[in-house]
C-alpha cells in the first residue's frame, strides 16, 4: 500500500477492525518504517476482531463519495473473518461494489493449500467481488501487480482497506 501510494497520490488507505481508520496521510512519510510506526501508534483496534459490515458502512457513508469517484478500484486486504451482522455485511458490500469500477478482495489465507472461504461472512461477500486473489507471498504481489496493470489506469482511482 505504501508503494502504491508513493506511485500515485490518488491512492487512499484505510484500516478496519472494529472501526474504520484513514491512514492515507501517514503514507506521505519518506521512510516506510516511519509510516508504519505512525500507523501502529494511531490505529487502536489491531487484533480486536473485525466487524466488516459496520466499518464498510462507515466508509460508504463518510468516504464513499469522496474517494470512489472516477471509477475507483478497491482493494480489500482481509482474511474475511467477521464478527458482525451478516445482513449488514451483505448490504454494505453491495453498496461498495455498486460504487466502484472494480472490487478486488485479497485474502492472505487463499494461497494456502486446503483453504476454503466457508464462513457465513464469505457467503455474502463473494457475490460482490470482481476478483478474489491470494496475498500471502511475493509471487502473489507480482500477480496482483499484473492484474492492476491490466486495468485502464487513466480511468481508475485506487482505494485500499487493510484489516487491522
Question: In which residue ranges do the predicted regions lie?
Answer:
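Acidic, glycine-rich A-domain
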Residues: 2-164
Amino acid at each position: 500500500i505504501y508503494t502504491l501510494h508513493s506511485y500515485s497520490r490518488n491512492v487512499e488507505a484505510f484500516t478496519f477492525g472494529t472501526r474504520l481508520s484513514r491512514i492515507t496521510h501517514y503514507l506521505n512519510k519518506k521512510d516506510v518504517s516511519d509510516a508504519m510506526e505512525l500507523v501502529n501508534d494511531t490505529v487502536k483496534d489491531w487484533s480486536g476482531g473485525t466487524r466488516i459490515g459496520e466499518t464498510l458502512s462507515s466508509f460508504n457513508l463518510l468516504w464513499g463519495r469522496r474517494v470512489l469517484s472516477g471509477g475507483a478500484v478497491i482493494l480489500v486486504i482481509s482474511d474475511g473473518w467477521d464478527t458482525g451482522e451478516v445482513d449488514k455485511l451483505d448490504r454494505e458490500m453491495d453498496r461498495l461494489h455498486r460504487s466502484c469500477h472494480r472490487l478486488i478482495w485479497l485474502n492472505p489465507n487463499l494461497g494456502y493449500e486446503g483453504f476454503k472461504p466457508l464462513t457465513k461472512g464469505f457467503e455474502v461477500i463473494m457475490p460482490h467481488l470482481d476478483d478474489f486473489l491470494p496475498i500471502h507471498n511475493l509471487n502473489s504481489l507480482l500477480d496482483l501487480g499484473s492484474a492492476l496493470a491490466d486495468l485502464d489506469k487513466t480511468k481508475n482511482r485506487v482505494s485500499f482497506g487493510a484489516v487491522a
